[in-house]
C-alpha cells in the first residue's frame, strides 16, 4: 500500500470537484482517469460493501453524487453491495404517526409499533428510492431486505431494546445471485427470527456481517466524520491507517469512544472473517468513495488486520 500520509486540506481542496471541472483542461481530466487505472484493476471483479448513512442520505446533491459513484464503480467491473440505514426518514414518519423515538446506548428502542414503521420506511420507501435513483443514473439495482432469501437471521439483542436484532447468520446466496447478474444489491437492514418476528438491525453491524460473509475485498462506512481522529476537535489529526491489534490501546486512550466503539468492533469482526480492508470516510464530501478507493492517498481511515 502507498503510505497514506498527506494533509487533510488536500482532501477538502478536492471536495469541490464540480467547481474544479471549470479549472482543468481535458488533458488533466484524462490524466486523473489514467491514475485511477491501477486501483480499478485492483478492485475489478472484487466485492466492495458500502454502508450508506448520515448526511449523505439527507442532502439530495450528495445522494446523487454517491449513487453516480456506485454506478461508475460497477461500470468498471467492481461488485458493489449497498447496505443502508434511514434514521432521519424513520424519525420523520414516527413523528407524523405520533410515536415517540427513544434511544438507548445509541440504538433505537424498537417496540412492535416502531418496528412496523421501521420496516415500512426502510424496505418500502428508502430502499426503493435508492434503487430508482441508481436506475436514473444508468445503473441496475435490486432492492432487498435482510428478510429476503433468508439473508439475515436474528435474535433479540437484549431485553432493553425490544425488536432490535443481533445477527446470528448471514445467507449470501441471494446477494451473490444479484451480483452475478451485474446488479447492485441495495439492502435494508431488516432481519427476522425463527418465529418470523421482524427486527431492526444497526446498519454498521449489518454491513460488517454481510462483508464478512461475502469475504469482501473492502468494507466502506460513509459517516459524518472525516475518519478516526486523535483529537476529535481537530480534523488535521486524522489517523490514516489502523491495525486491529492497535484498537484496544486506542480505546484505552479515549481516541475510540462512544458510538465509534461498536462501529469499529463490527469492522474488526469483518476483518477477522476475511475482509481485506475497512474504511471510515466522510460521506459529506462529494465523491469521497472514489477518492478512497481509486487514488493513492485515500481520504479517510483505513483498518487492516496486518
Q: What annotation goes with each model-predicted range?
A:
Residues 1-15:
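Single conserved hydrophobic/aromatic residue that forms the stacking wall/gate
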Residues 13-284, 291, 295-297, 304-306:
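Nucleotide/pyrophosphate-binding catalytic subdomain
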